[in-house]
Amino acid sequence: MIKCGIIGGAGYTAGELIRLLLNHPDAELTFINSSSNAGNKITDVHGGLYGETDLVFTSELPLDSIDLLFFCTAHGDTKKFMENHTVPENVKIIDLSMDYRIEGPEHDFVYGLPELNRRRICNARHIANPGCFATCIQLGVLPLAKHLMLNSDLHVNAITGSTGAGVKPSSTSHFSWRNDNISIYKPFTHQHLAEINQSLSQLQKSYSSRINFIPVRGNFSRGIFATTYIDCKIDLVEIRRIYEEYYDDHSFTFITDKNPDLKQVVNTNKCLIHLQKIDDKLLIISMIDNLLKGASGQAVHNMNLLFGLEETVGLHLKPSAF
């Protein structure tokens, strides 16, 4: 069994991660650290887990008793923890924050997008789990980058559910504001652009195009629906072949002929991609569950790879489409 610890257990991604690990046949939750909830039952915070666990949050850090440490912390907190604590060499780390997503000589975290870096993930010790928008957008265009086809600007519009804003309420996540409403935020400047550009440059060394990304707040709870378009003169049959070839040996990303609906992926670790060609424009629709494929499901996928398991173990999940 893989003995797991979680630091930062009160948020939405932590709740989903706890649920996945409790039901994973090869994982055992050893502790869940939460400074704000120490001593409280997990079910006091994550009510959907009633009957699933008797665990309580702790302020202790028994790092010597685990094989894998997950960080579900606010951005910046993982880095602070690593600077002030010594994690045993034998303990692997998966960080769900953005602290180590940009690779560099100052750390050894591998960017944990399996559809891009599966081989490197299998041989890594520290994994930086990708962002939710970054995951959805990258999966839509990675095959183009591999075939050196990103030679003009990408135009992306992506709408996300309210859980993407985290568990702490704010003026823009309050129900009375978010319900029956829609708005954009951080146009052209979203923080996930850096990791997207890093990945595309990794596959296509000549890549220097701009990503014109408009993030949108949706009036639903979970999921990301992204539409991307780019200039492309190649016919749709060849484009589809390129995508199917790229994702042929990946377990969670699928190309669909039918125009898909977001509910087909909500509550799963899947990404659905639909391709359309209109004149010289290629339209790419990609969609994921922001808390699963965009966060905790992808973290468990990375755990499976780190420990030599079949990558779908613990991730056969039913969509909430009906």
Swiss-Prot record:
InterPro entries to which the protein is assigned, alphabetical: AGPR_AS, AGPR_type-1, NAD(P)-bd_dom_sf, NAGSA_dehydrogenase, Semialdehyde_DH_NAD-bd
Positions of transmembrane segments: none
Record has Ligase as a keyword: no
UniProt GO BP: L-arginine biosynthetic process
Compartment annotation: Cytoplasm
MF (Gene Ontology): N-acetyl-gamma-glutamyl-phosphate reductase activity; NAD binding; NADP+ binding
Chloroplast listed as a keyword: no
GO annotations of cellular component type: cytoplasm
Catalytic activity: N-acetyl-L-glutamate 5-semialdehyde + phosphate + NADP(+) = N-acetyl-L-glutamyl 5-phosphate + NADPH + H(+)
Protein purpose: Catalyzes the NADPH-dependent reduction of N-acetyl-5-glutamyl phosphate to yield N-acetyl-L-glutamate 5-semialdehyde.
Protein name (record): N-acetyl-gamma-glutamyl-phosphate reductase
Species name: Parabacteroides distasonis (strain ATCC 8503 / DSM 20701 / CIP 104284 / JCM 5825 / NCTC 11152)
